């Protein structure tokens, strides 16, 4: 008899599953007999419990298991027979009216949608390009120098002495202070500290606090009012005004290392050659620029694909992805050391929009890959692994690390597929190239 698939909406379907009671009962009897061989009951040796007693105690549980298995098997059979592309898990409910000789259930489920991808020639993508020159290399060297800064006390004698024992604190100096803060003449938690160090101008402290410390000499103090922002992380003081007194204990000036052979060696250039150092920095910056431009253009391509595609998204797939995102969030909390992170009450609803985009994009990409043969080839995967491994000290070991784990390799395969899609779309879309600075590129990729 043909199966009747009811259309309940754009993607929702329903089909009736009928299971002959005699077939179900035979399976129940067979499982009860198998169970009886190992079941234990007081007063009986293992395997010697009367079958009737085993059936009385376990028949309900066994019947539920058999029905669950049979329903799943029959649904799978019907799905194949009717060429149903089921999205997510179906729900099964017993029908209100039951026949005498059969169990009847309604299976409600969603199917995968038809994906219509519009004309790629209408898609618009802006592709950023970046040139790495001396200015970018010098800027990177400046950052590397600041990362290796050493602080020396004002007035210190010797190689790094500055003779400035009476110099007032200025931006860039590391200062050590005592401070006392009160609100309405009452001290508050976190408002008092001794020998507290920070670097002026780094923005670690609130602006009013840094301004008060600027210009002080060792031994001097200043009293000032500070209004905490309304969104300050300390809820007890947020939006309130405190009166602080800060006392300067120590002022240290920053000594940046010279760019010389020793500096180059500290960056891994064994012979200290400055030309080699700059060449290696340039290579690293170009690699980073390539990675960031690829990431930005990939996001633009994905946005363009979503814009020109038409499809309905199965709710079941969105809900599944919401749960995946919840678990990812819990894992992130666990890695940060948050107690009981695996049970954190994270509402799935907060990921609804993100999950819908991810599912929709996945369906569009699957259709595009299938229709245009954009699957990842083994040689493409290997080329990407080799490229990634270049930035490590032992590239061969990194390659072995990738190929020793199927999950890691699958992640690289997914990356290659995305790259194939991006290249395919760029070959057909309206692409505008735009030259941007490395700093602008870094800012754009951080926001993407």
Swiss-Prot record:
UniProt record, GO biological process: 'de novo' cotranslational protein folding; cell division; chaperone-mediated protein folding; protein transport; protein unfolding
PROSITE patterns membership: FKBP_PPIASE (PS50059)
Transmembrane segments: none
Domain PPIase FKBP-type: 172-257
Pfam families linked: FKBP_C (PF00254), Trigger_C (PF05698), Trigger_N (PF05697)
Main localization (coarse): cytoplasm
GO terms, molecular function: peptidyl-prolyl cis-trans isomerase activity; protein folding chaperone; ribosome binding
Presence of the UniProt keyword Isomerase in the record: yes
Compartments where found: Cytoplasm
UniProt GO cellular component terms: cytoplasm
Classification via SUPFAM superfamilies: FKBP-like, Triger factor/SurA peptide-binding domain-like, Trigger factor ribosome-binding domain
Catalysed reactions, as listed in the record: [protein]-peptidylproline (omega=180) = [protein]-peptidylproline (omega=0)
Enzyme Commission number(s) from the entry: 5.2.1.8
Superkingdom field: Bacteria
Gene3D superfamilies reported in the protein's UniProt record: 3.10.50.40, Trigger factor ribosome-binding domain, Trigger factor, C-terminal domain
Keywords: Cell cycle, Cell division, Chaperone, Cytoplasm, Isomerase, Rotamase
The keyword Secreted is annotated on this UniProt entry: no
Family: Belongs to the FKBP-type PPIase family. Tig subfamily.
Task of the protein: Involved in protein export. Acts as a chaperone by maintaining the newly synthesized protein in an open conformation. Functions as a peptidyl-prolyl cis-trans isomerase.
Free-text comment on this protein's domains from its UniProt entry: Consists of 3 domains; the N-terminus binds the ribosome, the middle domain has PPIase activity, while the C-terminus has intrinsic chaperone activity on its own.
Official protein name in the record: Trigger factor
Species: Burkholderia cenocepacia (strain ATCC BAA-245 / DSM 16553 / LMG 16656 / NCTC 13227 / J2315 / CF5610) (Burkholderia cepacia (strain J2315))
Encoding gene (name): tig
